[in-house]
Structure formats: structure tokens, C-alpha cells
């Protein structure tokens, strides 16, 4: 009897061991990827902005063209296109593709999407990019040919059409009643992209399955789950526990944690080339920053090299200008604002701001107190604003920090109720043309840059130069115009360039056969990812 009991126990132990091994292998499925994100995914609407997330929209929906490596515009839903000699007419030959519900993608569907994006009630949301302002007409010539006519030649047209939003295409079955996707949410997120929404739970997760009817090369992965984890430490703990496979993006974990992972042989860490610029925007509409001397003093009061080295642990490089010199038309030969706290103090004193008994500067009864909001879910943003708070206390400036959820942060920015705020250049394919266009545009949904700059004496000249450059066919004149704008912005000192941003990735050694960065920072590199064989992944 005892022997039988021992045999039974041994059998049960073997079953338990097998189950554990299977569970471990299941967590390393070669066709499944689990990642973490800091914000909810929104409504998965291709035409809206916040709260919808770029990475989600890019997975489900496609445009006529897409942004490829080294800035090359590649075919997407348009197989090819022709541009008229005068640069005003674009004719797109559409590929025979299927939406994820099996319906056909065609020129009539393109027109229907254009109709809602650029309707009279909605186009004001999109005048931050110049294509909206230049669009004269569009029409379906036949089932697979779509024509766009512009008011003037606009050389960045294909770059605007490659943007992740808003010019991406929703299937007919996804449109709400009345077709207004800005006013109403989509009935169902149906696109032609590589991924189909399988299941989602607000503020928890969203799971995608591979679009098996995709017109192009299918991803190696079959399923992707994005888990919503607002806290950086929670994301790191989930990764270490094996609950997520990949950390990819900007600000998702603290840089201290990233450095620890880089030293641990269990993990593979990587840093992309610079993709955009991290900026501090000074609101010149606020009384404290109406004096250019104060804005220039603040530019002298930021040790960018220290920020790059200590806050970003060398994963980002110090930025002296709004765009890196590798950005087209951006090398304007500007003289950087040197870090010099004494010079900053002298400039503030010359501007009439004197220290009181508490060590805080004041002028005409007004304290030099700055309201600085930041996004609570971004670990590096918190580190940055706390650095400003401590550094500027030496100058006699009282910095008041306010933590906000991301949606609230940008909603507040659109009202102009801030003294300073962290913002960013947009990276490819938006820099410099679309980013500069936004400086000129009073879009219906608001632009903090436009609000912050509108009181500048040079604002009219900045707008004129940008609008002229956007429709200038001569590349040398375009280059000259953009450099003049950058020189004016540099002199006005409304931006403090901080660092050139990169994307980081972290994963367990042996988990991936292929892994690389996407060409733009607002997309996931899912089309480039292949996981290793399950036995190899489990072994590591």
C-alpha cells in the first residue's frame, strides 16, 4: 500500500512539474508579444488625437504611404503615385487590399474618410499641418484611383500623408451614424493594418491578433498584448517577473533602472539614434516671460550636459537647438546659450527682479514663482522638473510643480494656463515642416506653442517665413526660410532645448531572433520582430 502511495505521489509530482514547464513555455510563446504602456489606448479611432495613442492607431490603420528608413516615403495603400509638373495634382494608384472584416479597400472608401477628416466642422482640428490648408479638392476617379488637387505646390505632401494620424482609413462598417468620427466614436476599429483588435479593457489591456488577410508581408508574431501600467516601477517589476517581454519607448522606466538592466547579463539593452528634441516651452503670454531678458536668462540657467549625463544616464545627448543638425533645413549656425548661473542672475537683476528676505525674487509686488505641470506617468519628466526646481532655487525662483495625468496635462496646455511646460519636437516625419506649421495655426483643439508665441513682436514675421517656405519649390529658398525662423526663435528664447530624445529597448537575452527600432518614435517595430524558439527562450 505504501509503495502504491509513493508511486501515486511521484506521478502527481511529475504532472505538476510538466504543468509548470508548460506554463513557463506558454509565457514565452514565439508568436506572442507582451509589452507595457503608460496610458490607456483610447477609442482606437484613426482620425482623433488624445486620448488615442499613436502606437495603437499605427497597428490597426494604414495611410496611402508610410515613412520608411532614412526618411524614404514608401508605398502603403497606394501602390504608386504620379505628381503633375506644376506639383498641384497627386494621382494615387490604390492596391487591392482588404479590411480586417473582409471588405474591399477602394477609392470610394478613401473619399469617405477624407469627407469626415476634412469636413467643415472637423478640418479646423487639422490645420496644424499644411496639407489641410492646401487641400483644394479630391475625388475617386475609379475604384482604384484617387486624385488630390492642391491650391499651391506643397513639397511635404507625401510626408503629411505618411503621418500616423489623422489621414488613415477606416472601413465602411466602422463609421458611426452620420460618419462624423470626431463627434462620435467608431462603431468598430476596422482597418487594413497588420493587426486586429481582439479584446480590450479600458485602463487594463488591449490584445491584437494578426490580420491574416493582410495585403503585404505578415508579421512573424500572431498576437500582441499591450498592458496599461501607469507607474514606471510597476512596469519594471512586471518585466522582471516575466509578465511582459519587451520594454520599448521613451520614459517608460526610470533611467536608473535602465542602467541596472544594461549591467545585467540576463538582459539586452539598446538606445536608438536621436529621434526628436526634448524642449522646455516658456509661455511668453504670461507676465513674467513677456520680457525677453528673463527668457534668455532662463536659457542660461540649464546645465544640459549634466541633464544628459545624470538624468538620462547618457541615453540622450545635450541639445543646443530646437532640431538636431541632421534634421533637414535645421543647421542654422546658431550660437548656443552657455550654461552660466551668474550670468542668469545678472540678467534677472537687470530686468528688475530682486531677491526679497526669503530669497525669492520679486518685481512690482509680483513673486518670481513659476507654475510647472508635468505628466505623472513619465518617470523622466518628474526627474527633470525636480531638477529645475532645485537648480532655479539658486537663482531666487520659486518653482511650483503639479503632477497631472497625460490627458489633463495636454488639456491644460491648450488653455495656455502654464508658465513653463515640457514639450517636444515631433520627430520624423513631422520635423521640421509640420512642427513649424503648428506654430502658425490656431487649431480648434488648441496648440500650446501657438498660444505661448502669439504675443511675441516677431510672431507675424515667423508666421510669414514659415508659410512662404511651405509652398516654395526652390529647396535653397526653403532652407533659407527655415533657418531664418530658427534664428528668430533662438533669439526670442521661448524654447529651452534640453536633450535630443532617443527610444530605448530592453528584453531578456535569447528571447528575440530579430529586434530593431522603428523608423519613427511613435510606432512600434512589430513588423521587424521575430522571437526565438521556445526552448531557447526558456533556457535563457
Task: List where the protein language model places each region.
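Ligand-site clamp/hinge motif
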Residues: 183-186, 210-257, 386-389, 398-400, ...
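Gly/Pro-rich hinge or "lid" segments in bacterial periplasmic/extracellular proteins
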Residues: 163-219, 223, 341-342, 346, ...
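N-terminal lobe/hinge region of extracytoplasmic solute-binding protein
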Residues: 36-85, 115, 190-191
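Surface-exposed binding/hinge segments that line
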Residues: 129-174
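Ligand/substrate-recognition segments at binding pockets and active sites
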Residues: 202, 354-428, 503
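Aromatic- and charge-enriched surface segment that lines or borders ligand/interaction sites
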Residues: 79-123, 147, 238, 288-290
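Detector for C-terminal structural segments
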Residues: 201, 301-332, 380-389, 412-540
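Structural transition elements
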Residues: 283, 318-356, 376-383
